[in-house]
Amino acid sequence: AVKYPVISVTAFGYRLEAAERVSRGLPVAGQAVVMTKWMGLEGTAVLAQEREAELLERYPFSITTAAKGFEKYLPVLPEAATALKSGATAMHDMRNGGVFGGLYELAGRLGVGLSIDLKKIPVKQETIEICEFFDLNPYGLLSGGSLLIVAEDGDGMVKALQEAGIPAAVIGRTTDNNDKVLHNGEEIRFLEPARPDEIGKVIA
């Protein structure tokens, strides 16, 4: 079994570990997909804690210290509460499988397609450095602490979250077909079903 910390989030009487349709009177396709904080937060924190000695062979202490500090970002109840008040259509608490896994599950649960801009997905430099060290894909790294929110007004949702002190960005939109498309500049690829989390390659 994989031995790493797993957080379980409960908000307002229901769990946010699967996509939840919050506002059932609204169509889901054609809405903005908002992501809070940064991808790979939980996995980065776990790797910095469990493999710090190895990381310090290449990186300064400041990198591992900052990465271990990502634990403070793991609670998602504040953004869930703000999203509910600000008209969220659906929410999904990302965990295993990283942002790619979270997006695939979100689309599947809601029965929509996706058009996602990879360059708009927020990531911390510490996550990039640590994933590079262990040869991991940061998009598939344990991402507890980040919430995916579907909303009619993506910019309005981002503004509400930022006013509450929660970093957020619009990373794409839902679509009315089953295609889950990832855009990276002019390059286009399709999102594949969630794979085992990248952290399992290092911590088993």
Model region roles, listed by residue range:
Residues A1-A204:
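Helix-biased detector of long, well-ordered alpha-helical tracts
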